[in-house]
């Protein structure tokens, strides 16, 4: 995220104003848990996060739900309960936002939870007893959603999977896509990184590959 702040013309920071806070959190976690060898593949995604902002709670809910659904089938048992609760919490928030019955789940959420039946049953009991303060929009944005994406990234990094770096990159890519679907992009930041600024940023942090795209959404997500 320090790269993004520099390219956006902000001060050097891992919490840039140019990026939605939860998307920035996903990017930080993915970067922290990715190996040195895998980190270079993240650099090409940096311009994609610049200018993606917005206050719509759908952004938080969609990023968190996608993160939980990706990680839940592969994480250790002790983290499955946390992420199963995360899936149900996100679904409940989306039900409120979209005006659908609370308790109704999207097909992908149902199929994901079906892979971890014991954790899903525990999560259903836990969420049914949750007080109103824990289900509020304020609590979801400030505490629940950040906790979900953190546990998803940590769980993937520690999971027994063939390519944790690849899964972490997917976590970030789908968070970018979820944010882009609901956020507005700042038109002042929509022209892509200035080549000179990008080159300076690469030199400053050790030489990530130079971007040669004209727009953030023109990135090839391999």
Region roles according to the model:
Residues 12-204:
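Structured binding/interaction patches within domain cores
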Residues 211-220:
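Eukaryotic low-complexity, non-globular regulatory regions
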